[in-house]
Amino acid sequence: MNRFKSIGWLLTSFVTILSGSTLAAHHEALQPVAQPGQVIVTYRGACPNEAIDKAITLIKETIAYERKNSPILYSSSPGVWSDGRIGAVDLHESQEAMEKAFAWQVADDKWSSMYEEIASSCGITIEDFEVDSLDSR
């Protein structure tokens, strides 16, 4: 019987130590949103509730187009803000890379028309979008 108590105590101790290590490491998978020097850009636009799903679909199509056609690599994720506005968050490697991406967007007729279609689907214009940037430090 003592042998089973010893094995039980040993197993309990082992599991406790492992679970503590596992729980302590759960934050290691999370990385900072941006590294110093990178730039985060947010887009926010009002959109009626009934138009949100279509607008998000259009944003996803625009992001797919960017990934395939933009000569400047950057990451973008679409979504709905807590206040119900639609938009996206982009991550650029630097201020210079962001400016090059913006220049490509303006020069690319298809991208520009896709952005206008997103705005139009919500009954707004592209000028109505709030675009803000954050320089990560």
Language-model-derived ranges and their functions:
Residues M1-L11:
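Bacterial N-terminal signal peptides that target proteins for export
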Residues W9-S19:
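Bacterial N-terminal signal peptides
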Residues G20-K110, A119-R137:
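Short S/T/G/P-rich N-terminal loop/turn motif that feeds into the first structured element of a domain
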Residues M114-Y115:
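Non-heme di-metal
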